Amino acid sequence: MDWFPLFNSLRIAAISTVVIFFSGIFAAYYIAKLPPILKGVLDVVLTLPLVLPPTVVGYLLLRLLGPTRPLGAFILEAFETKLVMTWWSAIFATVVVAFPLMYRTARGAFESFDRDLADAGRTLGLSNTWIFWRVRMPCCRQGILAGAVLAFARALGEYGATS
């Protein structure tokens, strides 16, 4: 029995989940603090891959990153490699389709965070960075981990956009 396909799927899903984890936390944290109108627009844009069929997402990525397209030509010129039909394109496609799950879950966790805890930290003289890592992240840990698990499962099961 050949185990390479399973290993390859796990490898792509793991790398994609690491990228999604940090970018999803970053996007969710900063978008949760924006005004409602801007938050709504960005929310629609970032969660669009959830409602599009995977083959449509794959087609759009091919059209965007193909070597004859401006972005694909830039990547070809700058890095002397094409991105389409490579191992990296599978990672990029899984990041695109699984990112909304991490983003929405983490954003929900950040929006449900009790701001009085952050205010209490500020009154004690803590910096925003310290409050983020020592107060906000531990309080939002369950939502963030749930988003990471959902993103990993989506990345592991992704076939449409990567085929």
Question: PLM ranges: what are they?
Answer:
Residues 1-111, 135-163:
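Membrane-water interface segments at the C-terminal ends of transmembrane alpha-helices
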Residues 124-126, 138:
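Glycine/proline-centered hinge or cleavage motifs at structural transition points of membrane proteins
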Residues 121:
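The alpha-helix within a helix-turn-helix
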Residues 107-118, 128:
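Membrane-helix/interface signature in polytopic inner-membrane proteins
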